[in-house]
């Protein structure tokens, strides 16, 4: 690791955990009551030490010179606006440790909730076929596989770069039997690569792009300057395009089996419209509009009759 100039100001008085923690927080420009900066500090210390907070205390962890250099570099990058997950090259999703970088969107807690709700609908221990549309880093597909290793899981995405990251994550986690396919869901024949299967899927789940492009100007630079725009934004004129295409495919193309579940993550302003889209189609039942932990309408689930 290349050393960098350590900026002006004091370095930690010593290499003890308490001193290093306070020093990182100060370099980030935070204060002890700043929850976000405390969280970023904890993530940096977790990464540089290879230990969680409790383990650092129990093991009386001390920072060596290499750790201090790494922390200094990370602080500089974070203050320039880079997401902490990209800086560390890792994130946690549904208890699964994932490699993450600018090839794919950073997984969010709301998406964990979608996985949890869909898993709750599965009462059989038999193998299911599961399709993740817009898989990105593979977070949903891999989280599902971690909970139901007997299932056959396929992740599709329009991005070569995202799929390469998903494959790497699958290998790292020992889930090399997952299927990863390059598919642009908005193409006229979006599932040519995967619709050759003899039967449909038992679960179709998707966290598609859903932010209208007009909202870009009000979003944080940490998001819009670093995360892939293609995974974030849709046109203002047709914000439900992915939902319409996927729901139609589940019915008209037989992607979803009878009794199978469809699960969407949605923009809170359009969740009701997605619910209405499915409610207008008599082939669906048990349609549910679910709120996230902040109380915002965020997920729509439905079962095919």
What is each residue range found by the language model?
Residues 147-152, 156-304:
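S-adenosylmethionine
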Residues 23, 43, 70-73, 113, ...:
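Alpha-helical elements of Rossmann-like donor-binding domains used by nucleotide-donor carbohydrate transfer enzymes
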Residues 58-63, 69-149, 155-168, 182, ...:
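SAM-dependent Rossmann-like transferase core, predominantly class I methyltransferases
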Residues 25, 76, 112, 116-119, ...:
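Solvent-exposed, non-membrane alpha-helical residues enriched in polar/charged side chains
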Residues 53, 80-84, 123, 228, ...:
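Generic structural signal for secondary-structure transition and capping sites
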Residues 11, 15, 19, 36, ...:
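A generic alpha-helix signature
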Residues 2-88:
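N-terminal auxiliary segments of SAM/dcSAM-dependent transferases
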